[in-house]
Amino acid sequence: MALENLLHPTNIKIDEYAKNATKFSFEALERGVGYTLGFALKQTMLYSIAGACVTSIKINDGKVTSLEDVIPCDETVADIILNVKSLPVTLAEGVETGTITFELSGSEEEIFSEEAKLSEGLAITEEVFICSYNGGKKLKIEAKVEKGVGFRPAQDNFKDGEFLLDATFSPVVFCDFEIKDARVGRRTDLDKLELNIKTNGNVNCEEALRLAATKIQNQLRNILDIEEINKGIFVEDPTKDINPILLKHVEELNLTARSSNCLKAVNIRLIGELVQKTENELLKAPNFGKKSLTEIKDKLSELGLSLGTLIENWPQDL
């Protein structure tokens, strides 16, 4: 079959069946194309769209240190953490972090997200119930908001007066797809792709789908121009003069899970990226302590490497 004769979806349906929830259907597609597109779009929406979320919570300036502590609310500490964590938040362009603060005193009342004090560039996009305040004693709740991509696990449950939270940054909270049979004329060997998307309201489902499709398109752009490739254009390997050990992934150092997660949190993937960091730079990374530093130095030493190494002509786009 000629490439120009391959089917493209001409029947596209959009069913917004609930708030922030939409089902898209595309037909007809060549057999197998439905699964390929569905899987790529799902993974991209869940793990590659940037967003913001609450990453840590401090109660009464860090004096509340346990989920069992008593606070002047009908809810438990765990309830409040879950309610604050569920806040759908956005950060303005150029703003990487923000703070949400609730300062409660006086008579009893029900507290909602609209009563929060927000740092500049931070917004809460939907009203969320926080707690039923019993009055009397003061209660202060502070939440840190960060931008990010994908999922970042908390390295500790509690540190420096803060409850640390697993961070799910994507505004897409659910995405799945189903492939059904489709028919065009006499052809019955075709796919129908049904894509089910739910978001937290920070972006609508159509925008999430559009962002994912654009990201996939950008990833493929460098291999789309077959004509240029056929001209035999030679691109010099930017890594040809670099020690092959430096191009290996840090996983090959066999670090402990804690040290590995610390490096992932600051996007250090290759040994070459790691050795160019100084001790002070690593110690500034979230949850990175001297024990992890010692372990990394020992592992690098076994390979004849050390931190603070300058690598000339290190490619920035590996």
Swiss-Prot record:
**Which EC class heads this enzyme's classification?**
transferase
List the keywords (alphabetical): DNA-directed RNA polymerase, Nucleotidyltransferase, Transcription, Transferase
What's its catalytic activity?
Answer: RNA(n) + a ribonucleoside 5'-triphosphate = RNA(n+1) + diphosphate
| Alpha C-terminal domain (alpha-CTD): annotated segments | 242-318
Q: Name one GO biological process term.
A: DNA-templated transcription
Database matches in InterPro entries: DNA-dir_RNA_pol_insert, DNA-dir_RNA_pol_RpoA/D/Rpb3, DNA-dir_RpoA, RBP11-like, RNAP_asu_C, RNApol_insert_sf
GO molecular function term, any single one: DNA-directed RNA polymerase activity
EC number(s) stated in the UniProt entry for this protein: 2.7.7.6
Q: Which GO terms describe its cellular component?
A: cytoplasm; DNA-directed RNA polymerase complex
- On the tree of life, the source organism's domain of life is Bacteria
Task: List the Gene3D superfamilies.
Answer: 5' to 3' exonuclease, C-terminal subdomain (1.10.150.20), DNA-directed RNA polymerase, insert domain (2.170.120.12), RNA polymerase, RBP11-like subunit (3.30.1360.10)
The record's region (Alpha N-terminal domain (alpha-NTD)) falls at: 1-227
Quote the record's domain comment: The N-terminal domain is essential for RNAP assembly and basal transcription, whereas the C-terminal domain is involved in interaction with transcriptional regulators and with upstream promoter elements.
Family recorded in the similarity comment: Belongs to the RNA polymerase alpha chain family.
User: Tell me, what does this protein do in biology?
Assistant: DNA-dependent RNA polymerase catalyzes the transcription of DNA into RNA using the four ribonucleoside triphosphates as substrates.
Q: How does it assemble?
A: Homodimer. The RNAP catalytic core consists of 2 alpha, 1 beta, 1 beta' and 1 omega subunit. When a sigma factor is associated with the core the holoenzyme is formed, which can initiate transcription.
Q: What is this protein called?
A: DNA-directed RNA polymerase subunit alpha 2
Source species, please?
Francisella tularensis subsp. tularensis (strain SCHU S4 / Schu 4)
